[in-house]
Amino acid sequence: MAVPKEVSFLASLLVLGILLLHVDAKACSQRNAKEPICTNCCAGRKGCNYYSADGTFICEGESDPNNPKPCTLNCDPRIFYSKCPRSEGNAENRICTNCCAGRKGCNYYSADGTFICEGESDPNNPKPCTLNCDPRIFYSKCPRSEASAEQPICTNCCAGLKGCNYYNADGTFICEGESDPNHPKACPKNCDPNIAYSLCLYEK
């Protein structure tokens, strides 16, 4: 029995739609895996909102950095980036770096999410950069793939930047940086072998 043209046409459209959805989902999932931050709602910083790769709101962070909650250190696969509100006139709300001194592989953004630059400094072979704060830079996003024992950053908890959290290669929290770039502490220059990468947030 012959299949009516309308049914054949609708079946073709359905198959095409499924194929396009599969390709789009695959492309999406590949893109999402490139630069997610590694955190979860409990461990996320209070006052910061966390979003998926397509901009869907996931949750507000629950942990006060001055009184952190006992949270697991797993990465919520839904979370891709965060946005933290700025308190006007508060210089502590932003990270202090510049494009030259910024970590290679990390992207730096303004407070409204405008891309400023990619960091230029390889932690294994740092460039001779000034230590001034670029007023345009508010926060950074670094690929999770950098959390690798093959490319650890060279710092320690004392010398680490205040407002940045430091992690080992498997994502375990090590410490929060203690050094204010405007009033740096007298810290040793040794590399803590436990530290592999950092995540810096720009709210207090």
UniProtKB/Swiss-Prot annotation:
Tell me where on the tree of life, at the top rank, the source sits.
Eukaryota
Q: Which Gene3D superfamilies match?
A: 3.30.60.30
SUPFAM superfamilies, from UniProt? Answer: Plant proteinase inhibitors
Which Cys-Cys disulphide bridges does the record give? C28-C100, C38-C75, C41-C59, C42-C71, C48-C84, C99-C117
Q: Where are the sequence repeats?
A: 25-67, 68-125, 126-183, 184-204
**Entry annotated with the keyword Repressor:** no
Q: Signal sequence: where? A: 1-25
Q: Which GO terms describe its molecular function?
A: serine-type endopeptidase inhibitor activity
Xref: InterPro entries: Prot_inh_I20, Protease_inhibitor_I20
Question: Keyword set for this entry?
Answer: Disulfide bond, Protease inhibitor, Repeat, Serine protease inhibitor, Signal
On whether Disulfide bond is a keyword of this UniProt record, the answer is yes
The record's similarity note reads: Belongs to the protease inhibitor I20 (potato type II proteinase inhibitor) family.
Protein name, entry field:
Wound-induced proteinase inhibitor 2
> What organism, scientifically named, is this protein from?
Capsicum annuum (Capsicum pepper)
Name the gene: PIN2
